[in-house]
Amino acid sequence: MTHLSKMPTGYTPPAEWKYPIDLSIDYRKPENRMYLLKAWVEALSYTEEHNQQVRLMDYAIEVTEGITQLEKIERKIWMAFLWGCCYNGIGPWTIYSEFPVPPQSPQEFKRFCDWYNLNFERMRFDTDCRYRKSKMIPCVQSYIDWLAGRTQMDAFRPLLETKLQSDQFVKLWDTAMGWKYFGRLSAWNFLEALNMVFGNMYQIDVPGFMLRDRDGSESNRNGAAFLSNRDDWVTKHGKKKINGCPITDEECDILEADLEQAFKDCVAEFGHITFINRLNFETSGACWLKKFFRLKNTRYIGWDAERTWDEIDYMERIWPEYSCKALWEARSLWLPDTLLCEKAPAGHVPGVQKWKMPVFFETGVPLHIWHLQQGTRWEPSEVYTNLKMPVRKIDDNPKSTSVNLMSLLKR
């Protein structure tokens, strides 16, 4: 059977990791951050966690029997749209399970409206997309109006087959931004998913990281700031946390250039393992890296696997009418057993492990990457026992004269 997307064949680690973690090194230090990024991206390239739940739902469509390739394509595009709307596994999978293609006829759209209103309370959207939950019906209506009776492939084909990649992106971006209640995040996530479900066939990508967008690009810009050892350029609502001054275009351009170079380096080193473009590198290489440098809501190898377990468990309990069998199957094929909650020893509490979140920030050691490289499961009792150094709290570090994380926090 020919598949449009990359299909999982079972997790296989490299014979030798290119960026092994040394437990005696503090990877918070500016001189070690680029190495940390590459170790992180290398790990994600093998677990494919940077493609999040989309890869699981896409797998479910690929293995669906009894439908044609064109029918699969229609389902894939619809799933990408739903991912842009919801940005989690629960919303897209439950809607898709009831409506595997857009509800374009008046009768089907009415059924969608009735179904959505009936199930509104148990529907879940990602926190960043929570306001769209109450606007989902007009959002879908806007998408259907744009389709104007066409199949999705017929509607997107002239945009996808644009000769110049820069023109292709502008057309796709302007189209997505034209749908009701779609903004930068939803348009970005939609295009990232659209490229993935086509197996990178159309090489959809953004020409740059848009770091001059003061609010819309704040998360990835702050990741670029940490990577560039410019922690004094970390902002909130476009203003530097250190002094309240707006970040300038010139400063944004410096960070853009640094992030672009890091992106190109990672493509050169890991692009043969998985496709890496700016659309997915923004999340994995910048936004998630930024979250290393805080105590709560951080990211780590296995975080996506754990939160996905939480979401599938929620659906099986709260939406029992829809099967999640294909999602469980995809997980087992993408991930090593050491990252699967369902393969954990007896007594393990599944789901997101919040005790993991502050470890890197407090010690400078990415134990999550180290454990993946060792092929071992990270257990709560092993938070510090594997370290060849004393636990180094932030306050134990001498004050640095460089502009780095520790000096910024002390200020």
Curated annotation (Swiss-Prot):
Record has rRNA-binding as a keyword: no
Transferase found in the keyword field: yes
Recorded catalytic activity of this chain's protein: 5-phosphomethyl-dUMP in DNA + L-serine = 5-O-(L-seryl)-dTMP in DNA + phosphate
Single annotated GO MF: transferase activity
Pfam families the UniProt entry points to: ADDT
Domain of life: Viruses
Location of the active site: E282
Outcome recorded upon mutating E282A: Complete loss of enzymatic activity
InterPro entries, per database record: ADDT
GO BP annotations listed: symbiont-mediated evasion of host restriction-modification system; symbiont-mediated suppression of host innate immune response
Keywords: Host-virus interaction, Inhibition of host innate immune response by virus, Restriction-modification system evasion by virus, Transferase, Viral immunoevasion
Protein role: Transfers serine to 5-phosphomethyl-2'-deoxyuridine (5-PmdU) to produce 5-O-serinylthymidine (O-SerT) as a step in the pathway leading to thymidine hypermodifications in the viral genome. As a final result of the pathway of hypermodification, 5-aminoethoxy-2'-deoxymethyluridine (5-NeOmdU) substitutes for about 40% of the thymidines in the viral DNA. These modifications probably prevent degradation of viral genome by the host restriction-modification antiviral defense system.
Similarity remark: Belongs to the thymidine aminotransferase family.
Protein name as catalogued: Serinyltransferase
Organism: Salmonella phage ViI
